Amino acid sequence: MARKAMVVKQQRKQKYATREYTRCTICGRPHSVLKKFGICRICFRELAYKGQIPGVRKASW
């Protein structure tokens, strides 16, 4: 879990655009965040298996 201080720090508007980075809105994880959904791969997988993300299906070919 992300520390509360880091989550609050990330939410503030940065002085320079290059300092901004994505963070998972559910768990606060800073790495492997899917920009389209705003959540990390781990949370995405859990929600997709539960069917809580509309339009996402398990791939089969």
Curated annotation (Swiss-Prot):
SUPFAM superfamilies: Glucocorticoid receptor-like (DNA-binding domain). Its cofactor is Zn(2+). It comes from the Bacteria. InterPro entries: Ribosomal_uS14 (IPR001209), Ribosomal_uS14_bact (IPR023053), Ribosomal_uS14_CS (IPR018271), Ribosomal_uS14_sf (IPR043140). GO terms for molecular function: rRNA binding; structural constituent of ribosome; zinc ion binding. GO terms for biological process: translation. Coiled coil: none annotated. One of its GO terms (cellular component) is small ribosomal subunit. Belongs to the universal ribosomal protein uS14 family. Zinc-binding uS14 subfamily. Zn(2+) binds at C24, C27, C40, C43. Keywords: Metal-binding, Ribonucleoprotein, Ribosomal protein, RNA-binding, rRNA-binding, Zinc. Binds 1 zinc ion per subunit. This is Small ribosomal subunit protein uS14. Binds 16S rRNA, required for the assembly of 30S particles and may also be responsible for determining the conformation of the 16S rRNA at the A site. Part of the 30S ribosomal subunit. Contacts proteins S3 and S10.
